[in-house]
């Protein structure tokens, strides 16, 4: 395997961590049909014990949810393409990340990353829509924790998804070890003008790939 192939794997693994993402949500109380949890912002949210009308907001959230549960439990997805098109095709409704759009599908749980506008989240909560905000992961370990967190909310198993991630990471590390004496300089720049600086997901993946991040 060439050095060029090794470096190209960065993009694949970075996208895996960005698009999928420890401890589960803190349980506060259980009434049978619902229970209270504390989300990533410290807000106490009442959620169903086994949500059946989930709306994941953002393509990355859709990737996680549709990899964990059957599409029949997903009330709607967004309008931006994700990485699970076959599962998404089985979800009939498409919505925007607004309170009005959410009301049209009557979700019993909306999952959103913490980069979403607090105002939009507040509007949904004001309409009595249960919204759980999770912290966007920036490292592989945080990604695993986020998957575990969401799986707990959905009353689903994350074992298969985590095992798949571990297998991919093992392949990458085995490949990187073949060139352990070399530390090429690499950089990440997205179409949105984002760079993978110190503390970013890209920076974390550079450690697995045994390369040096120029922007760190």
What do the predicted segments below correspond to?
Residues 2-11:
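Bacterial N-terminal signal peptides that target proteins for export
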Residues 6, 21-60, 156-186:
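Bacterial Sec-exported substrate-binding components of ABC uptake systems
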Residues 11-20:
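Bacterial N-terminal signal peptides
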Residues 53-105, 109-114:
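A short, structured surface patch at a secondary-structure boundary
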Residues 70, 127-129, 209:
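Short, structured coil segments at secondary-structure junctions
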Residues 78-83, 198-216:
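Alpha-helical, coiled-coil/dimerization segments enriched in small aliphatic residues
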Residues 111-114, 133-137, 154, 187-199:
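Short beta-strand->loop
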Residues 119-159:
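Charged, glycine-enriched surface loops/patches
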């Amino acid at each position: 395997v060439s050095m060029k192939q090794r470096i190209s794997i960065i993009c694949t693994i970075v996208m895996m961590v960005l698009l999928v993402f420890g401890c589960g949500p803190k349980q506060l109380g259980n009434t049978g049909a619902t229970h209270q949890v504390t989300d990533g912002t410290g807000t106490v949210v009442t959620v169903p014990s086994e949500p059946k009308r989930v709306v994941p907001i953002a393509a990355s959230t859709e990737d996680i949810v549709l990899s964990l549960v059957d599409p029949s439990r997903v009330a709607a997805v967004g309008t931006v393409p994700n990485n699970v098109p076959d599962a998404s095709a089985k979800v009939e409704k498409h919505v925007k990340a607004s309170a009005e759009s959410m009301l049209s599908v009557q979700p019993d749980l909306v999952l959103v990353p913490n980069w979403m506008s607090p105002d939009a989240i507040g509007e949904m909560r004001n309409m009595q829509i249960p919204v759980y905000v999770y912290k966007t992961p920036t490292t592989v370990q945080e990604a695993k924790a986020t998957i575990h967190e969401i799986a707990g909310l959905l009353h689903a198993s994350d074992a298969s998804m985590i095992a798949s991630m571990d297998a991919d990471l093992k392949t990458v590390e085995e490949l990187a070890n073949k060139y352990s004496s070399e530390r090429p300089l690499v950089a990440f720049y997205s179409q949105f003008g984002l760079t993978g600086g110190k503390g970013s997901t890209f920076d974390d993946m550079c450690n697995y790939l045994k390369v040096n991040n120029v922007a760190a």
